Amino acid sequence: MGVTGGLVRSIFFRNKSFGAHDYNNGRGNLGEKKRWSSVRSYLCGDEFNSVRAVNDSESIKDSEALLTMSQQLSSEFGMPFGSVIAIEDSASVRHLEDEDSGSVKSSEATVTQPLLEEKSKGLDCYLKEEDVEDNQSEATETHIPKKHQTTPISKLFLEEDAAVIIQSAFRSYLAIRRSKEEEETFAKEESFSGEESQDNASMGTSLEAQTGNSVKAPFFRRKRVSANRRTLQKNNTQVLRIKEDWDDSTVSSTISKSRIQSRVEAMTKRERALAYAFSQQLRICSKKKQIDRSSEDDSNIGWSWLERWMATRVPDSIPIEPRTDVATKNQSLIRKNRAFGTAGELESCASNDLPLHFESISETQGDATTVLQTEKSSFKPSISKRKSVPSYKSQRKHHKLQATKSDLQQQTKKAKKAKTTPTSCKTGNECEETSHKLNSST
């Protein structure tokens, strides 16, 4: 009502005070004022009707004050005609005021009735719920004077405000309850998270058993796709770096493009060469490892530590004196064989010592067998059966060892012939002696 009401008043309400020179114009414009009042009530509707009668009364009082002022002026300046005009003007003004008030009341009645009907239909639900409050308010209104009683429009506004307050409170209550329910559900989910994870694992295994495919297959596919994308991005970034390099040369675009392409090709060739060299290094290292393993296996193919100990071990029945003689003979043979294999020691660390050591063992075994035969012939009645059994067993073991030793010696001879040359011998006599010994041992 604020601005629009002021505009309506400024347009439709005219000053009700007329001077002496406007007397005839005032009477001629009565019909126009009536028309304006009807138009005003039709157009302005609620805004005009909402203007209270207080404003009208104030305007009427202003007009009366102006009329009194005009009468005083006419009396002071000695204008009797003006006084008559003023009286007639006051009568006409009062008549117009009565007509305006009647039109305003009729317009208010016509406008407020449909508005009240429409709003009452929309607010039946609120009125039904608050019948008790309305009855109480009506009971109190009987005691309230007419000046303080509220209009039906203000009552509707109060009811709407109360409904808004009630709805806001109810919505806040619903929001609080919803938040509490969400917190409770979240706590329950956290408490049962362990059981759900086990259920998920069992479901995954059951799916694998039913379909025959692993559940992680799409995960690996995604990994492959991501790896391919990364390689493509790396290649693209390298090309972009080459292109982004500042080129100060005054060369055509075709030549610059050919240069960039040549750089890319050179880079790819370099990468291929590095990859090939790395693969060759891996192959060489793997071959070396295989050779080392094979050599270790070949060295382990020979006798075990127990067999070697049994071969070098002398039987318990041999006296002490012949043992010392055997040791001196073995030492002399080993010295001669070492003098023979000085040139071959440069190639291998201990390849020549083992077979020669076996040769010395074979010779000692012959001597040991002769000694045993003499002892048996001389001490037949004195030796018991229990002591004689292990001696025969030891002889059988020695014969078996000799057979295996002979095979190994033949293999070592072949290897020596393939590796060493006849220049390895210092003197012909030593070579003949060693060859004669080898033949005698075989």
From Swiss-Prot:
The keyword Nucleus applies. It is found in: Nucleus. Its main location: nucleus. Belongs to the IQD family. A motif (Nuclear localization signal) lies at residues 385-392. This is Protein IQ-DOMAIN 33. It comes from Arabidopsis thaliana. The gene is IQD33. PROSITE patterns: IQ. Residues 184-212, 375-442 are annotated as: Disordered. Keywords: Calmodulin-binding, Nucleus. Residues 383-402 have a biased composition (Basic residues). GO terms for cellular component: nucleus. Residues 270-282 are annotated as: Calmodulin-binding. InterPro entries: IQ_motif_EF-hand-BS. Pfam families: IQ. Binds to multiple calmodulin (CaM) in the presence of Ca(2+) and CaM-like proteins. One of its GO terms (molecular function) is calmodulin binding. May be involved in cooperative interactions with calmodulins or calmodulin-like proteins. Recruits calmodulin proteins to microtubules, thus being a potential scaffold in cellular signaling and trafficking. May associate with nucleic acids and regulate gene expression at the transcriptional or post-transcriptional level. Residues 199-212 have a biased composition (Polar residues). The keyword RNA-binding does not apply. Residues 159-188 form the IQ domain. The lineage of its organism: Eukaryota, Viridiplantae, Streptophyta, Embryophyta, Tracheophyta.
